[in-house]
Design a protein with these regions (language model features):
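Long, low-complexity, Lys/Arg-enriched
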Residues: 1-232
Length: 232
């Protein structure tokens, strides 16, 4: 069981154990490792062939920044008194205070839910995540945008999940401009943000247009990935 997003951990475990089948269950899956049996990979919120709109409104970086353990990342284990103790890369997660606060708030929220239909759980989760991730308020950006995030395996080079970008840097993220930059037609530098929607709202300029363009670019990327999956 893992948050996601490409299934390589499951593939590695299967190869290490030399088992023919190991099933993995994920919050979401953008893609599946090549030559792997897709029936072993189970995505809850979306998978490579399902949930295109949900992917377009989703920020996996924000998800990881919020739904993470308060301890530092485990990088190994050592044996102490016949027990294996995890070794972390830092004393604690730099986001620990807000993570602990969110855990307490989440406990209160869960206890207040009287009736929960597990069959409608995807829709329920979408109603919570979509407005926050794809069209956040300034208050939500102030609350979550300063969480530190790193896409490095060892969690180095921590940055705000909603990077503080200039108007020009936001414009370079728009669908047509970014596509032209990516294929080399325009010579511009792209300044990435782990949560681009948060950066757009934080800047506060041409918000609606930039948010629409961000969704359009994400949808284009995931349609392309879906085509690639089907033509393997």
């Amino acid at each position: 069981m893992d948050s996601g997003w490409v299934g390589t951990l499951q593939q590695t475990i299967r190869h290490l154990t030399q088992k023919e089948r190991i099933d993995g269950f994920y919050f979401g899956l953008y893609e599946i490792p090549k030559d792997e049996n897709s029936s072993m990979y189970h995505g809850f919120y979306f998978d490579p062939l399902r949930g295109l709109d949900r992917k377009s409104y989703f920020s996996n970086c924000l998800f990881e920044a919020v739904f993470t353990a308060p301890e530092g990342m485990t990088v190994g284990y050592e044996c102490q008194n016949e027990r294996y103790i995890p070794i972390t890369d830092m004393e604690e997660n730099p986001n620990k205070p807000i993570i602990l606060e969110n855990i307490e708030l989440l406990k209160s929220y869960i206890s207040s839910i009287q009736n929960y239909d597990i069959k409608g759980s995807v829709t329920f989760v979408e109603q919570l995540l979509k407005p926050l991730m794809a069209r956040p308020t300034m208050y939500e950006v102030e609350e979550f945008g300063d969480l530190l995030f790193s896409d490095d395996v060892l969690e180095g080079n921590l940055k705000k999940v909603a990077a503080e970008l200039t108007h020009e840097e936001i414009v370079n993220q728009r669908f047509l401009r970014k596509t032209l930059i990516m294929i080399g037609v325009l010579k511009r530098e792209i300044h990435e943000s782990a949560w681009i929607e948060g950066s757009i709202v934080r800047l506060g300029e041409s918000v609606d247009r930039s948010l629409r363009s961000a969704k359009k670019y994400k949808k284009f990327v995931y349609i392309r990935k879906r085509i690639q999956m089907r033509t393997r």
